Amino acid sequence: VIPVYNEGANFPALWSEMTEHLDFPFTAFVSYDFDGDDTLPVAQQIIAQGETRLKLIKNTYGRGVVGAIRTGFDAAPPGPVLVVMADLSDDLGQVRRMLELYRQGSHIVVGSRYMKGGRLIGGPWFKQLLSRLSGLTLCWFRGIPTHDATNAFKIYDRAMLGDIRIESQGGFELSLEITVKAFLAGYTISETPSTWRDRTAGTSRFKLWKWLPHYLKWYFMAFQPKSRNRHVREELRPT
């Protein structure tokens, strides 16, 4: 699942990286907000050249990255669902290892910047600080088995995604919400080292101060007692 917002400058390089590192069958769902997105003609040109693994899907939840990712989740078939940013920040060389952990029974596999062997290169220092602190404290003090709960670069089990009650409204809070709720509901989480690099083209839409209250909501939720019924969709709860 690839949420995009005017990533035309980055998409050719992203697709090249994907075809280099993902040497197994996959379908890439490019989820966009509006028909004028400059990613679309670039992706359409790749499709016109005979590429059948690339699918364009329009956000059905309302504009924004949360809706774009959820639209991709809805389109994804059963099995592992990988979320990849289009800004070339994610370490696609780690996907095979992430898939190995998924096949060993993990419901979420995190590409972790903050575990031993992981790296974060570039980006605003204060954003880095908050991200690192939240990931490490959730691991050390709550026992969530990843050092990087906030990273969007994750593999999710599609069936688990269908169980979790998603409430995120905006920003990249979605990845933290799902991780926290999956942990509290008893799903298995694992991680592997990953390198994150700040974008070199295009404009980031990350709005720290606007989205921080949403992150804090899920951060503090993590310290609640574990309870599957509280965090899965209502129709899945026992009557």
Regions found by a protein language model. Name each.
Residues 4, 31-33, 59:
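Conserved sequence signature across two-component system core domains
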